[in-house]
Amino acid sequence: MERIKELRNLMSQSRTREILTKTTVDHMAIIKKYTSGRQEKNPSLRMKWMMAMKYPITADKRITEMIPERNEQGQTLWSKMNDAGSDRVMISPLAVTWWNRNGPVTSTVHYPKIYKTYFEKVERLKHGTFGPVHFRNQVKIRRRVDINPGHADLSAKEAQDVIMEVVFPNEVGARILTSESQLTITKEKKEELQNCKISPLMVAYMLERELVRKTRFLPVAGGTSSVYIEVLHLTQGTCWEQMYTPGGEVRNDDVDQSLIIAARNIVRRAAVSADPLASLLEMCHSTQIGGTRMVDILRQNPTEEQAVDICKAAMGLRISSSFSFGGFTFKRTSGSSVKREEEVLTGNLQTLKLKVHEGYEEFTMVGKRATAILRKATRRLIQLIVSGRDEQSIVEAIVVAMVFSQEDCMIKAVRGDLNFVNRANQRLNPMHQLLRHFQKDAKVLFQNWGIEPIDNVMGMIGILPDMTPSTEMSMRGVRVSKMGVDEYSNAERVVVSIDRFLRVRDQRGNVLLSPEEVSETQGTEKLTITYSSSMMWEINGPESVLVNTYQWIIRNWETVKIQWSQNPTMLYNKMEFEPFQSLVPKAIRGQYSGFVRTLFQQMRDVLGTFDTTQIIKLLPFAAAPPKQSRMQFSSLTVNVRGSGMRILVRGNSPVFNYNKTTKRLTVLGKDAGTLTEDPDEGTAGVESAVLRGFLILGKEDRRYGPALSINELSNLAKGEKANVLIGQGDVVLVMKRKRDSSILTDSQTATKRIRMAIN
């Protein structure tokens, strides 16, 4: 109070006012503060002060020729004074108004193209639906989210090259556009932006928005795809949320969603094949998502999901250093441990070999619907703070944490035997055995865990074994919190290794991911996923396997035919026949295979019995390991359409129908392709008889002159070679035998050799 009186007193004296308003500021510290650096120290004051002047804006000199000196009201628009320190002129804010009203109008055709992301956003909002506002506690957790809908997925460097090429094509500097997407975008943008008058810098900024994924670490409760994030400020506050349905989808969200589905399908399929890693790579390389190669998407897309990360690891890309267990992402935030093997007994007296983590560690656990903080020591859970969307999600998190803790009371809570297997029928490792067991039923686990009295801590509440909340008691060490646990923000990527069975390890040998961690959730992809690999034929069911197998044989008939006669074993082992085996009843597979292989051998040995249609029809059955038996079959059974259907060994059936006149094959009524050659090889027998006494060496060789007819062959001397015309106009090279004794065998090998030579 005293100070205020004193100040009032001072202000009443005229000298004080004069000192404060008229004296110059010459204190060096103050001058330094306001003049050092380019950064404006008080922008709003500067703006007000500038705009109070008559000519606060500078413009290019040419403006004086384009704007009158005075407007209709007679106000001066520009000053004859030059701007100090540049060759620009000083103009009034009124000049801007005049320009906006009367200045030249340029073409607006480029605006929607340049500001594409903005125009699209307006459309999404126009067609979006905003629902009611609910007031409730929001469990938000910080997640790394995509804040920029509608972008391509180029790296910053790739985008920079594209932007330079589009906006400043004549600038110097090495730009190498390599990826498919870079080239497509550059071509498209150059066409769109012909004669564009918008400032190049603006165009560059807008292109960057379109090409690069921008992520931020934001608190989110609810949808995390970019079309939800762009309206985050409208849909969730501290204590309220507003329902919202986006008015459109964007390709980047669709790519993320479809990539996850493709990766899950591929990992699940690879896990059950003979060589999971090789199969996984083969499938990743032969799959397209929305017309783009999956491997290109994997290289550019930062989505972190278990299956996606396994595919990335297989391709040698870096992935996040966090690990996955029970569908939760674990990130160690402090402490350390060493691994030691230990044998433990379950409640059912089954022995389990556990890799025990010894030492104190703290983790954050982040799942789709629940998050937690876990503190543990060697085989002991010290504290678990969980938050989740609903009771079910909280239960999931508690089970995973209890199993992860490796506590004895958890192992003793096992009732019955643990014999869970993965898709390939291999036993799961002990930790996943325990996890599956308690995910099925956690009652005994929670009952055996033990309870303790709790202190009243703000925002925390106890939870009892039957999942009812309580303020007095709680399961030992477990609390439920209103606040979520943030996702780990560090986006560091580490080098990892992957073994044949798709287990991903960091450089210290800790397992980060394995196929057991891949979600079984099925979804429908937003973009078309095209799996070209035979391993994915069964994804659309047995019929698709049947049709695809026969289509493959027909497409590759030329090479298949040669292998059939020269190297059948290699042909039978082809992976394209693997999916077919699941259609053949297990008990009879071996007998079918033995029968078909024997039949084929007879065809190779006996003249004139080569039958294209029959070979194509029966070939897939020969792929199973054969059992030798005397059994003969007139039809073979395949399991499709929910029952066994028959393929006739001789003749057509609804499953396999070959039309001789059109040469078309239909499998289960679906077109499986056309045979390009005539399956009627009846003439072979005659020719082989005529060629007795000659050895067929192979394809035509021009050095031995023009082709002779079969009749002209008799003039050849022993050991002499010649080209000869046979059958339907094919030419082969033959040599007259030096000895007569081997003549008998010629007719048998001739058929085979003619066939090979022609092919």
From Swiss-Prot:
InterPro entries to which the protein is assigned, alphabetical: Flu_PB2_2nd, Flu_PB2_6th, Flu_PB2_C, Flu_PB2_CAP-bd, Flu_PB2_middle, Flu_PB2_N, INV_PB2, PB2_helical
Entries under Pfam families matching the protein: Flu_PB2_1st (PF20947), Flu_PB2_2nd (PF20948), Flu_PB2_3rd (PF20949), Flu_PB2_4th (PF20950), Flu_PB2_5th (PF00604), Flu_PB2_6th (PF20951), Flu_PB2_7th (PF20952)
Marked site positions, Mammalian adaptation: 627
GO molecular function: RNA binding; RNA-directed RNA polymerase activity
BP term (GO), one: cap snatching
Keywords from the named record: Cap snatching, Eukaryotic host gene expression shutoff by virus, Eukaryotic host transcription shutoff by virus, Host gene expression shutoff by virus, Host mitochondrion, Host nucleus, Host-virus interaction, Inhibition of host innate immune response by virus, Inhibition of host MAVS by virus, Inhibition of host RLR pathway by virus, Inhibition of host RNA polymerase II by virus, mRNA capping, mRNA processing, Viral immunoevasion, Viral transcription, Virion
Motif Nuclear localization signal location, chain numbering: 736-739
Keyword tRNA processing among record annotations: no
Keyword check for Nuclease: no
Cellular location(s): Virion; Host nucleus; Host mitochondrion
GO cellular component, one term: host cell nucleus
Function per UniProt: Plays an essential role in transcription initiation and cap-stealing mechanism, in which cellular capped pre-mRNAs are used to generate primers for viral transcription. Recognizes and binds the 7-methylguanosine-containing cap of the target pre-RNA which is subsequently cleaved after 10-13 nucleotides by the viral protein PA. Plays a role in the initiation of the viral genome replication and modulates the activity of the ribonucleoprotein (RNP) complex.
Quaternary structure (record): Influenza RNA polymerase is composed of three subunits: PB1, PB2 and PA. Interacts (via N-terminus) with PB1 (via C-terminus). Interacts with nucleoprotein NP (via N-terminus). Interacts (via N-terminus) with host MAVS (via N-terminus); this interaction inhibits host innate immune response.
Family: Belongs to the influenza viruses PB2 family.
Protein name as annotated: Polymerase basic protein 2
Organism (species): Influenza A virus (strain A/India/6263/1980 H1N1)
